[in-house]
Regions:
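P-loop NTP-binding site
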Residues: 1-8, 12-17, 203-354
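Helical mechanochemical/support elements of P-loop NTPase systems and associated helical scaffolds
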Residues: 3, 69-72, 99, 140-147, ...
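Conserved, well-folded catalytic cores of nucleic-acid-processing
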Residues: 25, 43, 79-83, 106, ...
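A structural preference for short, hydrophobic beta-strand core positions in alpha/beta folds
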Residues: 35, 183-185, 342
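Short, aromatic/basic amphipathic alpha-helical patches
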Residues: 47-54, 168-175, 324-329
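A short acidic, often aromatic-flanked loop/helix-cap motif at beta-alpha or helix-coil junctions
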Residues: 65-68, 190-194, 279, 348-351
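Canonical P-loop GTPase G-domain recognition
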Residues: 141, 145-155, 159-222
Length: 354
């Protein structure tokens, strides 16, 4: 049996960490599993490198959402299956909607009978559930809700952050609000729920529903035009033996958060990944200007040079985002006396707004 699942979910919902935990768990306990990282920037995504450093069989599809590259996705899946992989999971960009139609129906129509599609899976973190339950409203609520409307399977992630009663309460609410989907809770950190997720993907199939989500309509376009993407890859030469890579990542994330907040913008997800030639690496995440910076993985030893990948998605005009993040990288790198060599940089708006 060969299964393929799309993991949708808003920025910071835990798609990458869940895919890493799931593929490692499934490979250990059941059969070979692999993951695909997908985003709009060029090659060298932070998520893909992080997955590989974490020991996963991982690859990436870049420059386009997998919604629009069915042929490339199909070729990748066929290659994995030929190598004996029974489960492949891929995310989509964190602001993406419409993958149920474009990916699942696209594959089934272009390659009838060739791919066994697992339940269309949407991850949601507790913070997002709390926001939706509060009915406070927000500029990106259309995306948050629409992703869940598409789901066959809703995965409440990061359940280690909640009491068991709160987990049950959130699951009840999700099932009531989105009755066409099953809902389960998992923790990529502790491993809770990974067996249930593995079994759900392998033993169930996609419903192939086509809910009306207003794709391409005015609300969709208004939401998308607020979003911008930033991708940066660089090499940093370290001058001093006492360089602290973890402090550098924290300070850089803090500086970007401060700059974004001062500009009256929001950054739902910033990913900072750095690694040394010796194989040691560190990763920092920022999931919004009002939230603490998370050190997902820490350097364990000093290093003399770093490769750094920065990926960010923000509700901010792209030209402004470019200036804010680029200036922060220069300021903090100068403070740490790092000599930078920029390999690539991209910054663009989903609506090309100024």
């Amino acid at each position: 049996m060969h299964k393929f699942a799309v993991f949708s979910g808003f920025l910071g919902s835990g798609k990458t960490t869940t895919m890493i935990a799931l593929t490692k768990y499934h490979t250990t306990h059941h059969g070979k599993a692999a993951m695909i990282s997908n985003d709009l920037g060029g090659k060298g995504l932070a998520d893909n490198r992080y997955a590989q450093l974490s020991g996963c069989n991982a690859s990436e599809i870049t420059d386009e959402c997998i919604c629009y590259v069915n042929e490339q996705l199909a070729d990748r899946l066929k290659a994995y299956y030929a190598d004996g992989y029974e489960l492949v999971v891929s995310d989509i960009p964190g602001f993406g909607v419409g993958a149920l139609d474009h990916v699942y129906h696209g594959l089934s129509e272009k390659y009838p009978g060739q791919f066994d599609l697992a339940p269309f899976t949407v991850l949601v973190e507790p913070e997002t559930v709390s926001h939706l339950r509060s009915r406070e409203g927000g500029d990106l609520d259309y995306l948050l809700n629409t992703q869940l409307v598409e789901a066959d399977l809703i995965v409440l992630s990061k359940c280690d952050l909640l009491t068991s009663d709160r987990v049950k309460e959130n699951l009840v609410w999700l099932r009531e609000q989105y009755p066409d989907a099953e809902a389960i809770a998992i923790s990529a950190l502790t491993g809770q729920g990974l067996e249930a997720l593995s079994q759900a993907l392998m033993t169930h199939t996609a419903s192939m529903r086509r809910p009306d989500i207003g794709y391409g309509g005015p609300v969709f376009m208004e939401s998308m035009t607020r979003l911008s993407e930033y991708y940066l890859q660089y090499h940093a030469a370290v001058c001093c033996n006492d360089f602290d890579g973890n402090a550098y990542l924290r300070d850089l994330a803090t500086s970007i958060r401060t700059a974004i907040a001062a500009a009256g913008c929001e950054i739902p997800h910033l990913k900072l990944l750095a690694w040394a030639a010796e194989g040691d690496y560190g990763k920092a995440d920022l999931l919004g200007i009002s939230r603490d910076i998370q050190l997902a993985h820490a350097f364990t030893a000093p290093c003399t040079e770093l490769a750094v990948v920065l990926n960010g998605s923000a509700a901010c005009p792209y030209a402004r985002l470019d200036t804010l993040v680029t200036d922060a990288v220069k300021e903090i790198s100068d403070r740490y006396q790092l000599e930078l060599m920029i390999f690539s940089k991209e910054c663009f708006g989903m609506g090309e707004q100024e």
